[in-house]
Amino acid sequence: MDYKAIAQQTAEQVLAYNQDLSGWKLIKSSKKVTVSSKTSRIFHGNLYRVEGIIPESAAHLSDFLFKHDHRVSWDKSLKGFNVIHKIDSDTLICHTITQSFAMGSISPRDFIDLVHIKHYERNVDIISTKSVDFPGYAPTSTYIRGFNHPSGYVCSPLKENPAYSKLVIFVQTEMKGKLPASVIEKSMPSNLVSFLLNVKDGVKTYRIPPIRARHSSHSSVHKKKEGHSAIKP
C-alpha cells in the first residue's frame, strides 16, 4: 500500500472540502463554535464541518494537533492513542480508541488512521486523516473497528489577528456496527463542539514554545532533564 500517495490525496480532498462552501446546513452553534453538515458523497452518512477560533498561531496549532503529545489528556473523546508507525516526519499511522458516547448507546470504537500534515501557501496547514489497513493491527473482538473517510483539520491565520487561528475540522466517520443513523446524527453535533473546545483548552494547557525559543533553550532544558530516564520527544 502506497501510504504516502494516499496521504497526499487525502490532504487534497480535505482542501477541496474547505474550499467548497455550497450545500452546508448549519445544525448547531454553541460557545462560538459552529457545526454544519452535508450528505457524504463517499458513504451513507454525513460530512461534518466544525469551525471555531483558537487563540494561538496557525503554526503552533497545527504543530500541537499533529504531534499528538498529551492527546489522551486533552481529547476527552479518546481512551487510547498510539503512533504505531512513522513513515516520515510528516506522515504517521496511528491507533486510536474512542470513549463510548451518546450516554453509552455508542460503544467504544478503534481506528487505524493514516495522519499527514501538509503546508500550503499563506501559512495554511492541513492535517489529514484516513483509515487504512496496517499489518499486525487487524480488527479484534474487543472493539468495533470504525473507519474514517477523508477527514482532517485546516489551520489558517485569522485575517483580523494573525496571532489567532481559524480552525476548520472535517469529520466523515463510519461508525460501523448496527447503529441507527438517527443515533449518530443526534449525538455528533454536541460531540464535535466539545472536541473543538477540547482543542482550545489543550493547546493553551500544553502550549508549545516558539521554534526559535526551543532551539535557544535546548541546552538548558537538557541539563534540567538529564537525570530522567526517559524524555518525551
Swiss-Prot record:
Region (Disordered) location: 213-233
Gene3D superfamilies assigned: 3.30.530.20
PROSITE patterns for the chain: START (PS50848)
InterPro entries, sorted: StAR-like, StARD5/6, START-like_dom_sf, START_lipid-bd_dom
A molecular function GO annotation: cholesterol binding
Pfam families hit by this protein: START
Function: May be involved in the intracellular transport of sterols or other lipids. May bind cholesterol or other sterols.
Listed name of the protein: StAR-related lipid transfer protein 6
Organism of derivation: Mus musculus (Mouse)
Lineage: Eukaryota, Metazoa, Chordata, Craniata, Vertebrata
Gene: Stard6
